[in-house]
Amino acid sequence: MRCVPVFIILLVLIASAPSVDARPQTKDDALASFRDSIKRHLQTLLDARECCPQSPPCCHYYYYGSWK
């Protein structure tokens, strides 16, 4: 009889724990780095598209990463 309250408490705790699907994605996401890289690349291309028609040196900066 002493184990019944402990067993009930454990059942309540297990039932209230978040499921695997409810947890946010962590660093273990294999594609996270790839997605971040693609977002940065697309943002660079969009920035260059706005800048390049007005200033050719700006294009060189966006495509090569320096003002050389």
From Swiss-Prot:
Residues 23-49 form a propeptide. Belongs to the conotoxin T superfamily. This is Conotoxin Pu5.5. Pfam families: Chi-conotoxin (PF16981). One of its GO terms (molecular function) is toxin activity. Keywords: Disulfide bond, Secreted, Signal, Toxin. It is found in: Secreted. Residues 1-22 form the signal peptide.
